[in-house]
């Protein structure tokens, strides 16, 4: 026996409560419960059992239940503002079975104002930051020949506005103002002019003008081409008569038989702006290459950029004795000049391995 076995036997004899053999612990296993399956009764036995019931027939043992028993949501009842609460001991103050009184059904007179201001019973939910905006406007007129016909108004932006988490100070607020010529009356311009959709408007973007600390205004002039309406053209055509005045009787007879032909739309001679196609000039690929240095083992090809790298002597302050090594003289590279498309190219002659048969 080993020393370990001796020690185990001695410890079991001296301290049996610690080193003694473990007590037999029965495993906690639940006994398996077997459900006995009731055998199906035969049809004859069922008929005999039905005769013993003294002819009593049970249609249903209980009423059919609904498939879904939905009791509704549990809502926390909150008193509407303005409702008077009366407490009477021993009496229920809430009658849930009855409907609300008509005094409670009718709302306040300023219910719409409360909804707009989100106060009273409408004081819930997130509030959007859509208050009155204060904008710094530029009153200067970069086009002196035009006068403002309308005030500066904020353009409605069609973007989907989501919840504003932080105040966006860099947000643009575009404004619009209609300008008309100074020499024409405002009524004539608005009534007698029509927009010509065939002609594209001329857009001129002006530089940003600083109107405050860290705030600027950029003016964009959009010149919309207009055309005169039919009424103004008809008056102009009627006034152009070069015939001499006729007697009154002859003029009536001529007016009865003559048909008036009026020009409704003026004739515009529209010439499309002809722009020359830009001819892009690309330089040769050799001019794009930078000045580069080749490895000393590479012999530079004549006609191309690149020089052999030579280390400068200023790098080492200590003078070294250089032992000249005799290097084999390399044969000069043979070059041929080829003219293609009027350009002379300097190409090196290819040298092949002796194993390659040309």
UniProtKB/Swiss-Prot annotation:
UniProt region (Disordered), positions on chain: 296-331
Up-regulation conditions: Expressed in the late phase of the viral replicative cycle.
Composition skew (Basic residues), residue ranges: 312-329
Classification via InterPro entries: Adeno_V
GO biological process, one term: viral release from host cell
Further details from the record: All late proteins expressed from the major late promoter are produced by alternative splicing and alternative polyadenylation of the same gene giving rise to non-overlapping ORFs. A leader sequence is present in the N-terminus of all these mRNAs and is recognized by the viral shutoff protein to provide expression although conventional translation via ribosome scanning from the cap has been shut off in the host cell.
Name of the protein in question: Core-capsid bridging protein
């Amino acid at each position: 026996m080993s020393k370990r076995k001796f020690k185990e036997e001695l410890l079991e004899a001296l301290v049996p409560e610690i080193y003694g053999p473990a007590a037999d612990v029965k495993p906690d296993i639940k006994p398996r419960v077997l459900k006995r399956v009731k055998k199906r009764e035969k049809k004859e036995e069922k008929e005999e059992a039905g005769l013993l019931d003294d002819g009593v027939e049970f249609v249903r043992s209980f009423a059919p239940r609904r498939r879904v028993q939905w009791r509704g949501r549990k809502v926390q009842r909150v008193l509407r503002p303005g409702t008077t609460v009366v407490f009477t001991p021993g009496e229920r103050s809430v009658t849930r079975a009855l409907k609300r009184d008509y005094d409670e059904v009718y709302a306040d007179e300023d219910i719409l104002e409360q909804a707009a201001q989100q106060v009273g019973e409408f004081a819930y939910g997130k509030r959007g930051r859509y208050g009155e905006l204060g904008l710094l406007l530029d009153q200067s007129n970069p086009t002196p020949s035009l006068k403002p016909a309308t005030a500066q108004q904020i353009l409605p932006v069609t973007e989907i506005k989501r919840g504003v988490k932080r105040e966006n100070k860099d947000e643009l607020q575009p404004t619009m103002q209609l300008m008309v010529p100074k020499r024409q009356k405002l009524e004539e311009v608005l009534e007698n002019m029509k927009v010509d959709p065939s002609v594209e408007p001329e857009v001129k973007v002006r530089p940003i003008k600083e109107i405050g600390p860290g705030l600027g205004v950029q003016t964009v002039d959009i010149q919309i081409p207009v055309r005169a309406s039919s009424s103004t053209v008809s008056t102009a055509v009627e006034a152009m008569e070069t015939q001499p005045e006729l007697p009154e009787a002859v003029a009536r007879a001529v007016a009865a038989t003559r048909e008036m032909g009026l020009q409704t739309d003026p004739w515009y001679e529209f010439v499309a702006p002809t722009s020359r196609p830009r001819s892009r000039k690309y330089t040769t690929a050799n001019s794009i290459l930078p000045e580069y240095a080749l490895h000393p083992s590479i012999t530079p090809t004549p006609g191309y950029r690149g020089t052999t790298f030579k280390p400068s002597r200023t790098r080492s302050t200590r003078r070294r004795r250089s032992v000249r090594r005799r290097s084999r003289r390399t044969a000069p590279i043979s070059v041929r000049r080829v003219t293609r498309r009027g350009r002379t190219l300097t190409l090196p002659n290819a040298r092949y391995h002796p194993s390659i048969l040309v």
